[in-house]
Swiss-Prot record:
Substrate binds at S99, N115, V116, R117, G265, G266, R267. It holds the Pfam family Coprogen_oxidas. Its main location: cytoplasm. Keywords: Cytoplasm, Heme biosynthesis, Metal-binding, Oxidoreductase, Porphyrin biosynthesis. Gene3D superfamilies: Coproporphyrinogen III oxidase, aerobic. It comes from Paraburkholderia phytofirmans (strain DSM 17436 / LMG 22146 / PsJN). Pathway: Porphyrin-containing compound metabolism; protoporphyrin-IX biosynthesis; protoporphyrinogen-IX from coproporphyrinogen-III (O2 route): step 1/1. This is Oxygen-dependent coproporphyrinogen-III oxidase.
Amino acid sequence: MTDSSYDAQAVRSWLQGLQTHIADTLGAFDGTPFATDAWQRAPGEKLRGGGYTRILEGGKFFERAGIGFSDVAGDALPGSASAARPQLAGRGFEAMGVSLVLHPHNPHCPTVHMNVRLLIATKPGEEPVFWFGGGMDLTPYYGYEEDARHFHRTCRDALQPYGADLYPSFKRWCDEYFFLKHRNEARGIGGIFFDDFSAPGFDQSFAMLKSVGDAFLKAYLPIVEKRRNIPYGQAERDFQAYRRGRYVEFNLVFDRGTLFGLQSGGRTESILMSMPPVVNWRYNWHPEPGTPEARLYSDFLVPREWV
């Protein structure tokens, strides 16, 4: 995070194009176009800037799908962003990124999350400090080993040109990050996660970010194309809703992006578009041994080397 030379406009343009491309592709896949909600912070608010929320609810395939682009600036970096960098506490900042969460109707199709972002911390009289963050992770309700391997293989291939050490490092970081400490349980089968990334310099760091963002559709679409027509009943939907509860718990208790948005005075509707539309909790519930639901816990919600 020492290189202060960066091109925010290049990142902004790529992020906007990425959002449009993913929304157009997923809208065609579903058969339902995404609605667009353009928003702008009013003068005098805590944050300056705006963004576009692309949202699809009640589609043929997606129960809820949100793809957000935001580009905001503020006068003081929130605690969730400066906890690991106390020297940056209180600096002004600009944050831009694309974040998406997709919740299919079919429980045999996994929920997926992807995020790519740039943060810039500023202070009068000092050089700006920039860093990239992001990743993607998969949350199945019914596990398929070939799907997990495909997802991780695509993540690995996206990172390979930028260093053989990146995938193992980002994969391990993802396993540690998307973990519900109060449940002692993983949220899903992981993927890749990274933050504070700028050591190779702006050009190489940005190229790596673009490779991750551009790999998303290749990682996810082949999985749901294969699973979208698998029959399911109410029991599978009930289990899906139960497991979605873990998604809600993680996002509200641990997720840095959610906490950053809420702490910085971000736009609540856009921040919480990641929430699943139908969720339930059951008291002290455990799946019956030997069932596909039990196999999710024993075979998938444990750290594994998928590639």
